[in-house]
Regions:
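Hydrophobic helix-and-loop "lid/oligomerization" segment in the mid-to-C-terminal part
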Residues: 1-127
Length: 127
């Protein structure tokens, strides 16, 4: 199944800039959900934006960060923190991009969100 989401890693930037990046990404017709992330202190800050009613940003943030940090927010806009050490302990040598993508795909599959597929979006190291 193709996925209609985008994941982008940003060089060190402020949380508000991550939100702006996410807002830009969901302006693309084929992208219903965006996850932007950056290094922050002892881990990574993530920002999630959604324009699809079945893809609640707050629930996705909590799901992605479960066991490695914490996340939450609102239905369309949310954020979270992934602690580097906890991520390494739980996921071994996987990069933050790989962890976010894996957890996001699992969330979509576990929640049977499939009727939205058509065009996939993936952007790594885009900003």
């Amino acid at each position: 199944m193709d996925r209609r989401f985008a994941i982008v890693g940003a060089l060190k930037c402020e949380q508000t800039v991550l939100g702006i990046i996410g807002d830009f990404m969901i302006q693309v017709d084929s992208v219903f959900l965006s996850v932007a992330y950056t290094e922050a202190g002892a881990g990574y800050q993530i920002s999630i934006r959604s324009c699809h009613e079945k893809l609640r940003a707050d629930k996705i943030a909590a799901y992605i960060c479960d066991g490695v940090g914490g996340g939450g927010g609102h239905a369309k806009k949310a954020g979270g923190k992934i602690l580097r050490l906890k991520m390494q302990e739980k996921y071994g040598g996987k990069s933050v991009f790989e962890v976010v993508e894996m957890r996001l795909c699992r969330y979509i599959d576990d929640n049977h969100i499939s009727h939205w597929s058509n065009v996939g979006g993936r952007m790594e190291n885009g900003f």
